[in-house]
Amino acid sequence: MPSFDIVSKVDMQEVDNAVNQAVKEIGQRYDFKGSKSEVTLEKDAIKILADDDFRLKAIVDILQSKFIKRGISPKALQYGKAETASGGMVRQIITVQQGISKEKGKEVVAVIKDTKLKVQGQIQDDQVRVTGKNRDDLQEAIRTLKGKDLGIELQFVNFRD
């Protein structure tokens, strides 16, 4: 029975490269001269520490542009609230989304069911497996999901006949 998996994964090496490029650009930019701004990557989170809101927004813009250049979707990033830190600094934590949460998995399965195709979706940990008897139905399900904006980046892997 043909099947495929729907996953939402981010290459952490690319995230590391994008953060390093952003740090390098921040160090070279004129508007950050004398600033104590810093960007650090910790496991699945990016910590941004900036002097003020203006610089924080500038750092986030730099990070987003670097992510896009490295082929990482902005949908894979979950932005935390900007909060004040010690010394008048501003801190923000950006979480890198790995996997499909249960709620998003339910949304994906609901979209698949709404298509009225003869396919079934099953939530398995952080991925969704879609099975069906007809390969064309599976491809139609992929097309439908690509057309929907579910708020996360989806990859379709492990297509088996």
From Swiss-Prot:
It holds the Pfam family DUF520. GO terms for molecular function: nucleotide binding. Keywords: Nucleotide-binding. One of its GO terms (cellular component) is cytosol. InterPro entries: DUF520 (IPR007551), UPF0234-like_C (IPR035571), UPF0234_N (IPR035570), YajQ-like_sf (IPR036183). Nucleotide-binding protein. Belongs to the YajQ family. This is Nucleotide-binding protein Gmet_3206. It comes from Geobacter metallireducens (strain ATCC 53774 / DSM 7210 / GS-15).
